[in-house]
Amino acid sequence: MSDAAVPPKKASPKKAAAKKASPKKSAARKTAAKKTAKKPAVRKPAAKKRAAPKKKPAAAKKPAAKKAPKKAVKKAPKKK
C-alpha cells in the first residue's frame, strides 16, 4: 500500500513552485500555521471544563444522600 501513496508525493512540485512564486502566500501559510498551532492549547482547558462537571454531580449526590437520613432520624423521635 505504501507504493500507491508515493505518486501523490511526487506530484507535489506544483505546490513547491506555487510557494516559490508567491512569497505573500507562503507568509499567509506561516501565519495560518501559527493560528492552528495555538488552537490545541485552547482546546485543552475546554476538555478540563468538560471533565469537572462530571465529578460535581457525583459529589452533589453524596451530600444529599447523607442529609436525607439525618432528617428522617430527627422526625422519628418527635413521633415517639
From Swiss-Prot:
Keywords: Chromosome, DNA-binding, Nucleus. GO terms for cellular component: nucleosome; nucleus. The keyword DNA-binding applies. It is found in: Nucleus; Chromosome. Residues 1-80 are annotated as: Disordered. InterPro entries: H1/H5 (IPR005819). GO terms for molecular function: DNA binding; structural constituent of chromatin. GO terms for biological process: nucleosome assembly. Residues 11-80 have a biased composition (Basic residues). This is Histone H1.M6.1.
